[in-house]
Amino acid sequence: MRLDTNSNVDFKAFESSSSSSSCLVKLDNLATWGGSQKTDTRLPITDYSTLGGPRHNRSPFPLSKDVNNRLVIWDGDMTTLDVDAITNTSDETLTESNIISERILAVAGNQLREELSTNVKECRTGDVRITRGYNLPAKYVLHTVAPTYREKFKTAAENTLHCCYRNVLCKAKELNLHTIALCNISVHQKSFPADVAAHIALRTIRRYLDKCTLQVVILCVNSNERGTYEVLAPLYFPRDQLEERSALWQLPKDIGGEFGEPQHPDPDRQIRIIRNPQHSVHMRHGHTDDDSDVSPHDMEGNSSDLEYGAKDMNGLSPNSYSSGLQTQLQRDLDRQHLLSDRPRAGVYENVISEGVEGIEHQERYERLLRRAQVEDLTEVSGIGCLYQSGVDRLGRPVIVFCGKWFPAQNIDLEKALLYLIKLLDPIVKGDYVISYFHTLTSTNNYPSLHWLREVYSVLPYKYKKNLKAFYIVHPTFWTKMMTWWFTTFMAPAIKAKVHSLPGVEHLYSAITKDQLEIPAYITEYDMATNGLHYFNPVPTAS
């Protein structure tokens, strides 16, 4: 089945390159899933109706010839397809080299590379960015970033992969595109289970085609993946009554929501072990085990901290966040309620309550500490982005982090973590403060939220407890938004300790000028932006 395209954009370069292409693949030459049954050489499907009861009482994905005729599963080179758009999977900087992205960039030419580096620059995990196709037969390329899969965070990874597929398909609909070629978005994430990824892809595509009746989706797979998709496709796209009936036994219990999003109905997957239960209890009552500093800005009555965010970075309302975040909040409330009446215990009782996971967590940190003490970390320490700079007015060590000097995309992040542990381990035994300078940073300086979450989870409780203040100097709106999101959903234990300051002089309320050693570019930027003597510091009395 072939639908006529209707694009309002005329790319002369595209027309000339595609007309001269000798290997252009038209949609008319591809067999749809509905027509593939005639040439299917596999053994007849097993009739499960003679076995025990099915998992589902009625078909969640009923037989639809119309839907089947708008799906193509194809083993071939996506860059040769004469379609409205193809997809590219990469990392957040869109510079990752994998078999799909390399092929797309090679055929599209340097113009696509230039657009990615100058205009697009980045794409966050689960989001989608659009560029022209240039020398490709396709008019557009839709770029997305697949999540990294870890068993501990599999729910988040599965939700995010669904978002990748759904956002790409919704963008195609928004642009009035009729034919779109999807790659296996998680193909370069070797840790992502192939069968789980296939279920998510097929389920999301099926829900999309049910709702959007004018689109044709070509799922491009390689020879190794094709077998998996051809085995699972009949569960979501049955071609006859026998396949539809057999799917009642073979489909997983989680058949997704309205749009195919994972729902994980198994309550066992919603239970997490609490590393610091007493700390969670204290957070529930509105205070921590220690008093956090008051922001100098708060003393002025003009706090620059971001308290609320009505929308996320894509302009979506909070209700449109993935269900995983809402579930996470409910879990935290439930577990805090269960622990609210638990009395304080001694050291040994705490070890027991934290369980095996807490012990393993401590052992992991100790292994990293031993590595940090023996490995050569000069490539990180030589950068000069993280160091101790004197003490604050209360005699507490001040840790300075210069964001501009942190090459997040060109550094071994594991060694960066080791250096962080080596520097801070002897300091965090007592109270300390951190001053982060966001001055003149760019996307190349931003580590992923996933890595930040990993670092936060690795560091023991003493890091959070003894941190008295975390100052962010020269924040941007994006910094404030992400800080609010991170401290709300990932690190609530330190939320009250984070203070955003518009200028260096605001720090002088907590840290005297002679104790603050910072690079010249920070002070020069501060003077150019705020002028001189714009704030009269009042020492904090605490």
Swiss-Prot record:
Database matches in PANTHER family: GANGLIOSIDE INDUCED DIFFERENTIATION ASSOCIATED PROTEIN 2-RELATED, GANGLIOSIDE-INDUCED DIFFERENTIATION-ASSOCIATED PROTEIN 2
Domain Macro per the UniProt entry, residue ranges: 58-237
Comp. bias regions, Basic and acidic residues: 286-300
Coiled-coil region: none
Gene3D superfamilies given in the database record: CRAL-TRIO lipid binding domain, Leucine Aminopeptidase, subunit E, domain 1
Superkingdom classification of source: Eukaryota
Pfam short name (any one): Macro
Name the record gives this protein: Protein GDAP2 homolog
Record family assignment: Belongs to the GDAP2 family.
Organism in which the protein naturally occurs: Drosophila pseudoobscura pseudoobscura (Fruit fly)
Stretches assigned to the CRAL-TRIO domain: 373-530
Region (Disordered): 277-304
